[in-house]
């Protein structure tokens, strides 16, 4: 029986694994895809918003003073996992967590693991948000953007009002024949906290406005997709006092970069209470859910930043899991 099973090998899971290893725990990490898969799914050559010291798994192991790229951060995480000999099993799709007395059974498609404690660090992107409109299909719509070259000389509709959509529109603006950006908000130049404001970083918003002014990107605010046809998308427009209107946008492809939500199925089926915001109920000090011995960390919680995910992953081991295991062994 393991002391701890960690589900997920993103920044929080890797940080927790380091903490478990350094505290002498018998642990394993179960990952259904690849190590740091969330980072892997970032756009190619993307520069992150945080600096190296905010993203490193161990202090002093990542160059300081600059913001790393996707590739640089992936290399750092993979190198750390290799050098520290972290016990990570990839390709293990966990289907169920069952509490049995003072231990857990963690079941995957192929096998079963027994553990005294479980830490779920499966990230915040388990359930992709969909447009949910007629005509939506994989042929017409993509929900993840990695590089612009497949869309060269094509007409692309980007849907979304956040950083991902804004950056994708910018990346496409020099290659695509036409880029249209559809956002639900009325204005992009308001702060995120303001009604109708967009959560776009200032250093992304400035070049976005430049591309809009140069007619490289057509912005359609106060809009949402109503229907998708084989060659276009029908947008509903909120025209204020004039009521609603519709506009047809010709497009070869649609990028719906409208976010995702955590998949809390494992937690809820294990008996953990899920709050109205779709995230688990947990003690903000220990990160223990309503099921004793079942912990959470990373973006599946309400901590949305990588820096915080790394800190919490390590902290859960030292201040929550270790004391619990020591109490149980007395």
Placement of each model-derived feature along the sequence:
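Short hydrophobic core segments
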Residues: 5-7, 112-125, 157-159, 250-259
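Beta1-alpha1 glycine-rich phosphate/pyrophosphate-binding loop at the start
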Residues: 11-86, 169-200, 274-277
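Rossmann-like NAD(P)H-binding beta-loop-alpha module
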Residues: 154-177
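Beta1/beta-strand and adjacent pyrophosphate-binding region of the FAD-binding site
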Residues: 1-12, 154-162
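FAD-site-proximal beta/loop scaffold in flavoenzymes
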Residues: 136-150, 260-305
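Residue-level detector of alpha-helix initiation sites
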Residues: 10-11, 34, 163, 301
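A Rossmann-like FAD-binding core segment of flavoenzymes
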Residues: 75, 83-106, 113, 176-277, ...
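A conserved FAD-binding loop/helix module that cradles the flavin
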Residues: 196, 297-330
């Amino acid at each position: 029986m393991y002391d701890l099973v960690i589900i997920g090998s993103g920044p929080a899971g890797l940080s927790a694994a380091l903490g478990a290893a350094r505290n002498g725990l018998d642990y394993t990490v179960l990952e259904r895809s690849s190590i740091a898969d969330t980072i892997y799914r970032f756009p190619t050559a993307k520069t992150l918003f945080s600096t190296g010291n905010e993203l490193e798994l161990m202090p002093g192991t990542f160059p300081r003073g600059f913001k790393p790229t996707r590739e640089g951060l992936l290399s750092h995480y993979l190198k750390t996992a290799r050098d520290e000999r972290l016990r990570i099993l990839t390709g293990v799709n966990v289907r169920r967590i069952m509490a049995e007395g003072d231990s857990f059974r963690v079941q995957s498609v192929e096998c079963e693991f027994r553990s005294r404690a479980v830490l779920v660090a499966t990230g915040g992107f388990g359930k992709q948000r969909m447009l949910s409109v007629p005509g939506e299909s994989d042929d017409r719509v993509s929900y993840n953007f990695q590089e612009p070259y497949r869309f060269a000389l094509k007409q692309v509709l980007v849907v979304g009002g956040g950083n991902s959509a804004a950056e994708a529109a910018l990346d496409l603006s020099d290659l695509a024949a036409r880029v249209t950006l559809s956002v639900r908000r009325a204005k992009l130049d308001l702060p995120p906290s303001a009604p109708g404001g967009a959560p776009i970083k200032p250093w992304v918003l400035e070049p976005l406005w430049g591309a809009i002014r140069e007619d490289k990107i057509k912005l359609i605010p106060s809009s949402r997709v109503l229907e998708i046809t084989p060659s276009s998308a029908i947008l509903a427009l909120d025209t204020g006092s004039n009521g609603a209107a519709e506009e047809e946008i010709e497009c070869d492809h649609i990028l719906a970069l409208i976010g995702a939500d955590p998949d809390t199925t494992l937690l809820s089926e294990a008996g953990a209470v899920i709050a109205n915001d779709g995230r688990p109920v947990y003690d903000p000090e220990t990160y223990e859910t309503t099921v004793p011995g079942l912990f959470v960390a990373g973006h599946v919680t309400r901590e949305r930043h990588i820096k915080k995910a790394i800190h919490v992953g390590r902290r859960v081991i030292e201040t929550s899991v270790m004391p619990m295991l020591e109490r149980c062994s007395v």
